[in-house]
Swiss-Prot record:
This is Zinc phosphodiesterase ELAC protein 2. It is found in: Mitochondrion; Mitochondrion matrix, Mitochondrion nucleoid; Nucleus. The gene is ELAC2. Zinc phosphodiesterase, which displays mitochondrial tRNA 3'-processing endonuclease activity. Involved in tRNA maturation, by removing a 3'-trailer from precursor tRNA. Associates with mitochondrial DNA complexes at the nucleoids to initiate RNA processing and ribosome assembly. One of its GO terms (biological process) is mitochondrial tRNA 3'-end processing. Residues 1-16 form a transit peptide. Residues 15-51, 189-231, 798-826 are annotated as: Disordered. Its EC number is 3.1.26.11.
Length: 826
């Protein structure tokens, strides 16, 4: 295999050196055009909505049950359509883990323009785009259109998917499964006041990238890309949108055996018009005898309704109770409501007015509650892998926690169920609760499974013997700084690795975040449990390396949750220092203008101002930098441009006690980073891809594992932690011979201190035993890939040229600045 790898490196080296010059930027491989999705072709064959009758199977399923770390989200399934109600941070990760496929998700309904409801929407849209979905329609508050414009600041123009906004004032929406009615509800503070966005009904508004923006802009204002408006919009938190969903009538099923008994021509072409007639409720005449439709068909299902309503606080209770549309569905309604989904805190549920409103739906209506009283575990795979890693080293891999249930819910006279992750309510074919898919987190099962793996127990015992006689140097025994890896995957959140975020606890009362991808707050909750407010209270700064979604879309939730945490701790709110590319301000400004006030939460330091030799013309920025260094007890906070997208930075933190932590962000091997990080105590470097994928790493402007290790060795770093792995390496990356006593592998929720450095390389044997099956699969994939490359090289004649040249030549590093990535890398 070594000879095969050498030949492949030789062929690859010749191909790259002959095919490009140093001055050329790495070319991007064209993606093959996606075929139309199968379900879209099927939909075309079915014809217009409702022509073939309603679906046979419809159910609602809880994606996120309302806990503080997961929010509230609901998935609705029929064989014709898929729907999502709310899309907060982490929803995409939960759907991926629990196999709730997003490929057919062409309708998303949002109850409120609040980050808890839309925090995961940008990532979900990017994923839908990559699946080849041609169109997605979003329904909800009026600011939704501006929000979708704003995310183009970091996502690009979103070509390839048509996004349409259905305003809450639009008429009902109808498709093959159901009719949806939107009900705008204003809190008591806004009732009776003119609502400027309540315009006459208008058709769907497409978000065209070509939409013009203001032609003039102040150079001091954040730069907004073409197509993003600079105008301040209507920002209103007093509006929620409820949804009433009415299933279409489902015609009865034709009784084949009964038809045979009656002598009907079953199995012939003549039976088709008979089936069509009786399903439409018409009688037929056969051999002089009239046969009623009910003799040959089961009764039709007229189609139940379900309601999704959010009541954020007590100011919305009276408007909900008095809403005329709801009243038409209460009591003796023509269309009985089978289920009401309440996204409401306990303070609302205990209010007698709200309880009476619930009772008016009648005793046959079920009620599902999604709120903070949920005690359900959502991220099962994360708990499982952490429990198993904890067997190797309990301190480095601490067990995860979950939020305790705050208190027992109110006792109501209506049938009420507290939401749990994956709980189902089936509307068709039979109305019933289904609990078989609900997650149960059983740590004992996880432990038994790990202990039964070949060589695992033996390797753990050998590891413990090897480290018990290797004490850390005296100067490294301090608990601080403490590094908590919260997200170690790239591109999109997945079931085991979340996207980029690393918490650096500088001292017991001071910490900072290195990047802040979607779901970072949820990771903090699972790591710290009910101590999360204390941790947020210590947060002094956030460094955002660049504007790809997997590195910054968790920031807003951190800001909002930090405000709540400081209030609970009795501390005043003060702005959080954010070191980031100045382009981040444009996104925050747009969200602030259109959706929710957030700018008072931050004081921004442009990352370029912390580069070596940078001139700082603003006294305000100088004061912020001084505050950053003083608060974090740092001698220096330095940044440098790295080789990734435009405006991508790495950083180096130098503490007054002498230690130095360097963070690469996303980058190819970068000399500027090597210089900045000289003699680092710890280098945290991305290692997105395995060795052998150097060409793909150049395409995507990332590093391989050996390239990352090489950077650390040239930097003379005391220790190197590899991070930001492609999600194809879900559990563990492929280890290479370049792994040495200075190299460790990061996992989500891993806790590392400098005193752990001697221990880290010794973790590799038990890790290999724990993940032996996964490593074997990855090695098989690598061997197949290498064989394909050999065949391709033989066909092109490159292999023969490589053999004639003798020694394999090292792949030449590219020194040019890579082209900007538009969305994200795998």
């Amino acid at each position: 295999m070594w000879a095969l790898c050498s030949l492949l490196r030789s062929a690859a080296g010749r191909t790259m050196s002959q095919g490009r010059t140093i001055s050329q930027a790495p070319a991007r491989r064209e993606r093959p055009r996606k075929d139309p999705l199968r379900h879209l072709r099927t939909r075309e064959k079915r014809g217009p909505s409702g022509c073939s009758g309603g679906p046979n199977t419809v159910y609602l399923q809880v994606v996120a049950a309302g806990s503080r770390d997961s929010g509230a989200a609901l998935y609705v399934f029929s064989e014709f359509n898929r729907y999502l109600f709310n899309c907060g941070e982490g929803v995409q990760r939960l759907m991926q883990e629990h196999k709730l496929k997003v490929v057919r998700l062409d309708n998303i309904f949002l109850t409120r323009m609040h980050w808890s409801n839309v925090g995961g929407l940008s990532g979900m849209i990017l994923t839908l785009k990559e699946t080849g979905l041609p169109k997605c329609v979003l329904s909800g508050p009026p600011q939704l259109e501006k929000y979708l414009e704003a995310i183009k600041i970091f996502s690009g123009p979103l070509k390839g998917i048509e996004l349409a906004v259905r305003p809450h004032s639009a008429p009902e929406y109808e498709d093959e499964t159901m009719t949806v009615y939107q009900i705008p509800i204003h809190s008591e503070q806004r009732r009776g006041r003119h609502q400027p966005w309540q315009s006459p009904e208008r058709p769907l508004s497409r978000l065209s990238p070509e939409r013009s923006s203001d032609s003039e802009s102040n150079e001091n204002e954040p730069h907004l890309p073409h197509g993003v408006s600079q105008r301040r919009g209507v920002r209103d938190s007093s509006l929620v949108v409820a949804f009433i969903c009415k299933l279409h009538l489902k015609r009865g099923n034709f009784l084949v055996l009964k038809a045979k008994e009656m002598g009907l021509p079953v199995g012939t072409a003549a039976i088709a018009p008979i089936i069509a007639a009786v399903k439409d409720g018409k009688s037929i005449t056969h051999e002089g005898r009239e046969i009623l439709a009910e003799e040959l068909c089961t009764p039709p299902d007229p189609g139940a309704a379900f309601v999704v309503v959010e009541c954020p606080d007590e100011s919305f209770i009276q408007p909900i109770c008095e809403n005329a549309t709801f009243q038409r569905y209460q009591g003796k309604a023509d269309a009985p409501v089978a289920l009401v989904v309440h996204m409401a805190p306990e303070s609302v549920l205990v209010d007698s007015r709200y309880q009476q409103w619930m009772e008016r739906f009648g005793p046959d209506t079920q009620h599902l509650v999604l709120n903070e009283n949920c005690a359900s575990v959502h991220n099962l795979r994360s708990h499982k892998i952490q429990t198993q890693l904890n067997l190797i080293h309990p301190d480095i891999f601490p067990l995860l926690t979950s939020f305790p249930c705050k208190k027992e819910g109110p006792t109501l006279s209506v049938p009420m169920v507290q939401g749990e992750c994956l709980l189902k309510y089936q509307l068709r074919p039979r109305r019933e609760w289904q609990r078989d898919a609900i997650i149960t987190c059983n740590p004992e099962e996880f432990i038994v499974e790990a202990l039964q793996l070949p060589n695992f127990q033996q390797s753990v015992q050998e590891y413990r013997r090897s480290v018990q006689d290797v004490p850390a140097p005296a100067e490294k025994r301090s608990q601080y700084p403490e590094i908590i890896f919260l997200g170690t995957g790239s591109a999109i959140p997945m079931k085991i690795r979340n996207v980029s975020a690393t918490l650096v606890n500088i001292s017991p009362d001071t910490s900072l975040l290195l990047d802040c991808g979607e779901g970072t707050f949820g990771q903090l909750c699972r790591h710290y449990g009910d101590q999360v407010d204390r941790v947020l209270g210590t947060l002094a700064a956030v460094f955002v390396s660049h504007l790809h979604a997997d590195h910054h879309t968790g920031l807003l939730n951190i800001l909002l949750q930090r405000e709540q945490a400081l209030a609970s701790l009795g501390k005043p709110l003060h702005p959080l220092l954010v070191v980031a590319p100045s382009q981040l301000k444009a996104w925050l400004q747009q969200y602030h203008n259109q959706c929710q006030e957030v700018l008072h939460h931050i004081s921004m330091i442009p990352a370029k101002c912390l580069q070596e030799g940078a001139e700082i013309s603003s006294p305000a920025v100088e004061r912020l930098i001084s505050s950053l260094l003083r608060t974090c007890d740092l001698e220096e906070f330095q940044t440098c441009l790295v080789r990734h997208c435009k405006h991508a930075f790495g950083c180096a933190l130098v503490h007054t006690s002498g230690w130095k932590v360097v963070y690469s962000g996303d980058t190819m091997p970068c000399e500027a980073l090597v210089r900045m990080g000289k003699d680092a105590t710890l280098l945290i470097h991305e290692a997105t891809l395995e060795d052998g994928l150097e060409e793909e790493a150049v395409e995507k402007t990332h590093s391989t594992t050996s390239q990352a290790i090489s950077v650390g060795m040239r930097m003379n770093a005391e220790f190197i932690m590899l991070n930001h792995f492609s999600q194809r390496y879900a559990k563990v990356p492929l280890f290479s011979p370049n792994f040495n006593e200075k190299v460790g592998v990061a996992f989500d929720h891993m806790k590392v201190c400098f005193g752990d450095f001697p221990t880290m390389p010794k973790l590799i044997p038990p890790l290999k035993a724990l993940f032996a099956g996964d490593i074997e699969e990855m090695e098989e994939r690598r061997e197949k890939r290498e064989l394909r490359q050999v065949r391709a090289a033989l066909l092109s004649g490159e292999l023969a040229g490589g053999l004639e040249d003798g020694e394999p030549q090292q792949k030449r590093a590219h020194t040019e600045e890579p082209q900007a990535k538009k969305v994200r890398a795998q």
